[in-house]
Amino acid sequence: MTRIIILAAGKGTRMNSDLPKVLVPLHGRPMIKYLMDSVVAAQVDPRPIIIVSPENKEIISQELKNYNVDYAIQEQQLGTGHAVACAQAVLAKESEPIDNIIVLYGDHPFLKSDSIKKFSKLNPETLTIMPTVLPDFNGWHRNFYHWGRIIRGADGEVEKIIEFKDASAEEKLITELNPGFMCFNYDWLFKNIKTLQNDNTQKEYYLTDMVKIAFSEGRKVGTVNIEPQEAMGINSQEELMIAESLLN
């Protein structure tokens, strides 16, 4: 069985909103609802979707009252790895076995149900990621420039994901990018997530460092590519305007 976690931390400050970022309207609807609808349509898991949010759970839960949802609270925003670790207590209450965990982001409204369904059927030994490849960073693709880069070895295998703020000038030229969507083997994830370190410029526990852990074990990291529009996230007023135009 596959469980789904949606990370929903983040404020709407950069979009001139007092709302949590995932509730900022996109064509009149909170942006997270587009993703929620895709998750429901994928029919991956009849059990509640787990939303990881900070202390503003109440306002998010009010908007999502018509969905089957459980909440995990991330009291301190210490990174995406820490956010997923916060969901472990909720998952531990399950009576049925869990095989896989899919991690999605509430500010990515364009992910399709078919992609979620495909992701759920992979059954990785460690993890699978969902990259997108750009032709360049021109036009609306410039909004992807600050995303993490997929680093591959000479054999073409994924070795790690490097976040933009930690990337070298050469690594920033890479156009295979990480939207953040990941599918994990449940046991492997929670065995290894506690070993994450925050030795980076942000001093955060990056979920993306799980790729490096898998590679260090000699494990292959799987990939399922998606188109740039499907991968797009919304973090600024400019990106919100682009997303609005893509929906027209």
Model-derived features with residue positions:
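Conserved beta-strand segments of alpha/beta enzyme cores
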Residues: 22, 68-70, 157, 220-222
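Conserved core of the sugar-phosphate nucleotidyltransferase
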Residues: 111-197, 201
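Conserved N-terminal catalytic core of the sugar/cofactor nucleotidyltransferase
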Residues: 30-106, 110-115
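Structural beta-sheet core signal
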Residues: 4-6, 50-51, 102-103, 129-130, ...
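Conserved alpha/beta core of the MobA/IspD/sugar-nucleotide pyrophosphorylase nucleotidyltransferase superfamily
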Residues: 173-248
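Short alpha-helical oligomerization interface
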Residues: 18-25
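Short, structured coil segments at secondary-structure junctions
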Residues: 19, 64-67, 227
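N-terminal nucleotide-binding beta1-loop-alpha1 segment
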Residues: 1-17
